[in-house]
């Protein structure tokens, strides 16, 4: 199976265009005001139109309420909901029934103990994203440039597709893929020159490095 590449936290037509032209399969838009990558609904509508038919549109939320989801779904028309908060299994099941969209749940990882809730989420989610656990004093759950010990996933037995994120860059994505055997990689801060400011060349370099890692993994 081909390695999926997701560029998350896109906010401008230029950087979205770079991701699409370089072949990203997924493009992520953040709907969380504390994040420097937050996009408003008007911008999301325009970016969604630009991405339509070229990549899967992913809406990232953090413990959002029903009204927020309704606005996002109506405006962006996402292909996938990415839940990055403390959403329960019951909440995820309700969202899937309500909107009829697949869900990717982010699991914050530091040690193998963080994998304990995975079984419940795997039953209801279409895809799992393993991300580095944020520090206790962090104001947002991801996009902080921190990695986690990828060997935590060594004994992983999961019947759902999964991706990895957290501190990925063009320099380490090959190692992440080699160790985790993930089906996809998700990057945000690793393709930025400042928080929330994506760099087109860094996006291209990351995708190029991910493709090289994919080729090595099938040899």
From Swiss-Prot:
InterPro entries (UniProt xref): Aldolase_TIM, PRAI_dom, RibuloseP-bd_barrel, TrpF_fam
Enzyme category, top tier: isomerase
Catalytic reactions of this protein: N-(5-phospho-beta-D-ribosyl)anthranilate = 1-(2-carboxyphenylamino)-1-deoxy-D-ribulose 5-phosphate
Key word Isomerase present: yes
Pathway(s) it belongs to: Amino-acid biosynthesis; L-tryptophan biosynthesis; L-tryptophan from chorismate: step 3/5
Pfam families attached to this UniProt entry: PRAI
An annotated GO BP: L-tryptophan biosynthetic process
One MF annotation (Gene Ontology) recorded for this entry: phosphoribosylanthranilate isomerase activity
EC annotation from Swiss-Prot or TrEMBL: 5.3.1.24
Superkingdom of this protein's organism: Bacteria
This protein's record includes keyword Amino-acid biosynthesis: yes
Keywords, alphabetical: Amino-acid biosynthesis, Aromatic amino acid biosynthesis, Isomerase, Tryptophan biosynthesis
Annotated S-S bridges: none
Sequence similarity: Belongs to the TrpF family.
Name by which UniProt lists this protein: N-(5'-phosphoribosyl)anthranilate isomerase
Organism: Bradyrhizobium sp. (strain BTAi1 / ATCC BAA-1182)
Gene designation: trpF
